[in-house]
Amino acid sequence: DAIMYGGLVGSRKHNESLDTLMARENRIQRLHPMYPNVPIYAFGTIMRTPYASNSGVEPYYYAKYGHDLYVLSGLQDKMDLGTLTKDEAAEMLSLKLSIPSEYLQDWFKRRTKNHAINRLLLKDTKSGIFAYFCEGHDDNSTNSQSAMEARYLGKESAKLSPKVYGSFPGADQLALLLIARYHNDVNHLTPSFTSIYPLGRAEDTVPSYESQPIGKTIAEHVEAVGGIMDPKGRPDIVLAVNTPLSSTGESGQFSNYGMMKPSTTEFMNQVKAVIDKGIPVSMVDVYFANGSDNTLMSLMKQHDLLYKVAAYNGWNTASNTIGYAIAQAILAPDMSETDHRDMLTEQYIDNWAYQANVRKNINRLTELERTNYI
């Protein structure tokens, strides 16, 4: 995305011609023949289909028509699958008539260009240009334009080995994930992982902003770094995945006020038992999206585990958290004690202090000031 569009946000808002994008992609093709002994690890993303009407990181018209575009793309995906009902067909026609045609054309034209580039990068993967290529699904949901594009790319990539190609939810975690993959490759490592969960839906939990169970996403990320899941013997790393009893919510919700929950208490006992055995534990806190679970963090502090884990993550989407949790746990043994402690401290300040607590208070104060000003 950085080479093709100038970055992830740029991939959503650019006005580049397809010829310009293809010329940039051609430069990537030429890298491998020029430097055949240098492995290339790369990632791209399937453009997201957000349901929120926010123009800050989307084209300007998303402020008014963003949600309508989201609903429309979901209906078009259903039509492609052959599951569209008569009522939904009528709704789809109504949306097409209500959204200005120039906005519809702009949005789908940009998506078409991005999809064409993704197909070219997939072709490069088949040609051996990349040591490993990862296709991230940015904020994907079950029915959307993103899901439809992923489905078609999935058909084209069906015969590719998972050792050279991966396609799964997420975007922000991909660069660090590839660093961990390179680390494993050059050191001839095949780390093994096992996951533990609290009571509830566990690996069958489908988190917010994503379209598949979290257990599948974890397995795909482990495969992406060259690891294996559920070894017969002692694992190299245990992923302690903090999932809710039912569905995931937002960390800024009132329900995230830190009330003690029996399931979380028992889960923390599991974590402590694994650490006492000397097995590295990486905390995958996906109870809420966009921030830490205050109950979990209070128990980690109470049990003096904040700096005894290999890694902690609880930020943004579940796949972002999973990718960082796996990658940081792989890289942690090669960090100095100071660097490792600093890494954890940064996560606690960002994920726990800011995202789960400070941010919601800032938002409330900002809204209060705006209301008073009006």
Where are each of the predicted segments found?
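An N-terminal assembly and electron-transfer interface module characteristic of large anaerobic redox
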Residues: 1-374
